Amino acid sequence: MTASVNDLRSHPQIKQRRAIVETPVPGKTHRHPRMEAKRERIVNAAMQHFAEHGYHAARIEDLSAQLDVAKGSIFQYFGSKGGLFVEAYKKAVRSFPTYLDSPSQIRERGFFEILRYWLLRTERLVREDWIPYRVALLGNYGVDLSLKREINRFLLAEDPYGSAAFVRLGIARGEVRSDIDSTLIVSILDWTMERFQDALLTEELDPGLFPHPADPQKNQMRINQFLLVLKGAIGV
C-alpha cells in the first residue's frame, strides 16, 4: 500500500513542525492591520531592492526614500538591514511551490520524475518571476555567515519546500532507501537540489558565478546525469 499525498502532508511530525513555526512571537502578535500592511509593503519593496542591488550594495536609506517611510521605522520593524533581508528571504522561498505541488499525473510517476519535472521547469519559473529567485540566490551565496545561519535555521524549522513529506512519499513508494535515516536523506536532497538548481539559474541571474552557460540541450543532459547520481545515492 502506498501513502497518499494528503496522508503524508497530515503526518503528525509535520503538524508538530508547523505548530512550532506558527507559534506567535512575543511582542509581534496582534499587530494593527495598518501596521501589518506597512510592514508587508516594506518587505515587498525590500525584495525588489535586494534583487536589483544585491545584499551588500542595498541601502536602507534608498529604500526609505522610495517608500517615503522613515529609516527609523524600518529599523523598528526589522532591527537591521540583515533582519529585513531575512524577512525578504522568507517571503521569497515561501512563494515557491513545494515538491508535492506538482501535477497529479507527475506525482503518479514517482519520486524521481517529480524531481525531473521541477528541474525542467526551473528556468521557466525564474523567467516568470525572477525577484524571489534572485533573493533566494543571494541568501544562499551573497550574505554574511551570521545571516546564513539564521536562514538555515528557518529552512530547517519550516521546511518550505516540503522536503520531508516528499521523502516519505519516496520511501512509501519503495523508490527511496528506507535503511538510511530519513532526516539525512532530506538533508542530502536539499543540499544537492539547491546547488544544482542554482547552477541552472545563475547564468540567467548572475552570469559567471557558475561555469556552465544556460544551454537547453546541455541542461537536459546535466539533469539526467544529476538524477542518475542522486538515484544511486538515495534510490532503491
Predicted regions, residues:
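Short, charged helix-capping/linker segments at alpha-helix termini
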Residues: 31, 56-57, 176, 180
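Amphipathic, non-transmembrane alpha-helical scaffold segments
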Residues: 35, 89, 93, 115, ...
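Helix-turn-helix
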Residues: 41, 49-83, 87
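Hydrophobic alpha-helical connector segments
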Residues: 87, 101-131, 182-189, 219-223
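Short secondary-structure transition hinges
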Residues: 123-165, 183-186, 212-215
